[in-house]
Curated annotation (Swiss-Prot):
Name used for this protein in its record: Lipoyl synthase
Cofactor: [4Fe-4S] cluster
EC number: 2.8.1.8
Residue positions binding [4Fe-4S] cluster 1: 68, 73, 79, 308
A UniProt-annotated Pfam family: LIAS_N
Annotated [4Fe-4S] cluster 2 binding sites: 94, 98, 101
PANTHER family for the chain: LIPOYL SYNTHASE, LIPOYL SYNTHASE, MITOCHONDRIAL
CDD domains: Radical_SAM
Main location (coarse class): cytoplasm
Enzyme class name: transferase
Family, per entry: Belongs to the radical SAM superfamily. Lipoyl synthase family.
Top-level taxon: Bacteria
Organism this protein belongs to: Sodalis glossinidius (strain morsitans)
Length: 321
């Protein structure tokens, strides 16, 4: 499809259609050029998928979305089978068009005012004790969706008084002060915002985002809420070096971040950014030791680690790979 002159509201643009809208073009990779996955990247699917289907049905019934499905997470089967999911609020259409991400791009619809209550009830029905709430970027909203986050946090706590809530927020570009003012009034238990990759590759990997802005967002929340942990994550395998990853880790430490996730980037389709390298489990272990030596209190580093992968265990300091 050629580049649309005007995107239709509510239409999801994916793969080649989404990439056509990015200023820095990504050339589709031919099948023979795709790096072969090493043995440690093989996923064993669960024999029983009953619980997986149950969670999907609950999501559809309440009109909710999970980032697990929308972003094609490789851990979906494992997490759903254990009765956990990362809820994605504010719709399933992102105003950004990052070429590593499988979430659809487009003009999103008006946020569902009933979503906080539906989300809270679904979490109660699932009996969750720890929940991760994330969102698409909503550059079309004055507060970037911050009030919706706050409403969801309040609604979840009202129906689930003993729950712990982790939020994985967008960068609130151009509206950080207003967004944090709203979120600080009803803060989560863990505040997460991913840097995703190293600053040298930002223009290609995160078009529309700013490395230093993201660091400032994490720092400003920490200053306002010194008792609460802040968290960030990176993908490896996009062309960065291990030395650059270590430099980012140092930047995060300097900005008060205490929880870190590092995981292998996987290409969602041949139209997305290609995998440049597969990082070995041994290298991930070395990065973890480096992170802990720097002062991180929690560091989950491994090929299948994602920001919200076993987030409840990460928060307890239990090793996750």
């Amino acid at each position: 499809m050629s580049k649309p002159i005007q995107m239709e509201r509510g239409v999801k643009y994916r793969d080649a259609d989404k990439m056509a809208l990015i200023p820095i073009k990504t050339v589709a990779v031919e099948r023979q050029e795709i790096l072969r996955k090493p043995s440690w990247m093989k996923i064993k699917l669960p024999a029983d998928s009953t619980r997986i289907q149950g969670i999907k049905v609950a999501m559809r019934k309440n009109g909710l979305h999970s980032v697990c499905e929308e972003a094609s997470c490789p851990n979906l089967a494992e997490c759903f089978n254990h009765g956990t999911a990362t809820f994605m609020i504010l719709g399933a259409i992102c105003t950004r068009r990052c070429p590593f991400c499988d979430v659809a791009h487009g003009r999103p619809v008006t946020p569902d005012a009933n979503e906080p209550e539906k989300l809270a009830q679904t979490i109660a029905d699932m009996g969750l004790r720890y929940v991760v709430v994330t969102s698409v970027d909503r550059d079309d909203l004055r507060d970037g969706g911050a009030q919706h986050f706050a409403d969801c946090i309040s609604a979840i706590r009202a129906k689930n008084p003993n729950i712990r809530i982790e939020t994985l927020v967008p960068d609130f570009r151009g509206r950080m002060d207003r967004a944090l003012e709203i979120i600080n009034a009803a803060p989560p238990d863990v505040f997460n915002h991913n840097l995703e990759n190293v600053p040298r590759l930002y223009r290609q990997v995160r078009p529309g985002a700013d490395y230093h802005w993201s660091l400032k967002l994490l720092e400003n929340f920490k200053v306002a809420n010194p008792q609460l942990p802040t968290k960030s994550g990176l993908m490896v395998g996009l062309g960065e070096t291990n030395a650059e990853i270590v430099d980012v880790m140092r930047d995060l430490c300097r900005h008060g971040v205490t929880m870190l996730t590092l995981g292998q980037y996987l290409q969602p389709s041949r139209h997305h950014l290609p995998v440049k390298r597969y990082v070995s489990p041994q290298e991930f272990d070395e990065m973890k030791q480096e992170a802990l030596a720097m002062g991180f209190t929690h560091a989950a580093c491994g090929p299948f680690v994602r920001s919200s992968y076993h987030a409840d265990l990460q928060a307890k300091g239990i090793e996750v790979k």
